[in-house]
A protein has these predicted regions:
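Hydrophobic/aromatic-enriched cytosolic interaction surfaces used to assemble or bind macromolecules
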Residues: 1-251
Length: 251
């Protein structure tokens, strides 16, 4: 068995162009990836175009922390063919976009009538990213989030706006806990407001090598060093699979 884990480039954010809001479009052209023989050991890693990605028996795509929204609901009792429509009805007021523009996916082992988490992603964007990989003969078996609501809490510090050939321009904190997931810049007061003080003692803290110094200064305590490739592999071990409903893998 061989596993290829691919990082989908973060979705372009809204930005101002001549006073108007615009969103850059088009799938990413280069991907960070890792390979593993068993999902545990990191074998190789790198960056390349889709057509140059290593071949593997299983392909897992990972979405960036900020590209997945999270909603806590009671799962409606609906037959499989109508479940997606039922979810859209429940979440209509909570979603920032029209329900038809959002891809929804249920948490593993979700049960009707019970509280569960629903992941929300831009449908057009995700469909375009999967299509770009498929065009290069890279067929994704599972799509997973980089982080998801969980206990105990996880705090991960990483560089932002980084050019691989140059320095990072800032540090972000990705905070996953029982009530959701948030990504905020370390600079300013929002990160302090987000994390309880003191943080739960069981919180698992980590940072990329380039963010360790800032993370430890902010926390006042050591953190585990976790390279981006290690975090990709960790995400791939989750039970989540966002390829549901109309984006389910066709075999």
């Amino acid at each position: 068995m061989s596993i290829l884990v691919v990082q989908i480039p973060p979705r372009p954010r809204l930005h101002s162009v001549g006073g108007a809001q615009a969103e850059a479009a088009g799938p990413g052209t280069e991907y960070a990836y890792v390979t593993s023989p068993d999902g545990l050991a990191l074998e190789t890693q790198g960056h390349c175009a889709a057509a140059l990605l290593p071949k593997a028996t299983t392909v897992i795509a990972v979405l960036a922390d900020a590209d997945v929204g999270w909603h806590r609901i009671v799962l409606p009792k609906a037959p499989g063919a109508r479940l997606r429509a039922a979810l859209g009805g429940v979440l209509e007021e909570a979603l920032l976009e029209d329900t038809d523009d959002v891809h929804l996916a249920l948490a593993p082992n979700a049960s009707a009538g019970q509280p569960t988490w629903v992941a929300a992603v831009s449908r057009r964007w995700l469909r375009g990213e999967l299509a770009a990989l498929e065009k290069a003969d890279v067929f994704v078996d599972r799509v997973v989030p980089m982080a998801w609501p969980d206990e105990p809490p996880i705090g991960h510090f990483a560089e932002t706006e980084r050019d691989r050939s140059g320095p990072a321009h800032g540090i972000a904190l990705h905070w996953a806990h029982a009530d959701g997931v948030a990504s905020v810049r370390l600079q300013g007061g929002l990160a302090r407001a987000l994390v309880p003080s003191p943080a739960p003692p069981e919180t698992r803290w980590s940072a990329t090598p380039g963010a360790v110094a800032a993370a430890e200064q902010w926390l006042g305590a050591p953190v585990r060093v976790m390279a981006p490739g290690q975090r990709l592999l960790q995400a791939a071990r989750s039970l989540w699979n966002l390829r549901q409903f109309d984006l389910a893998r066709r075999t």
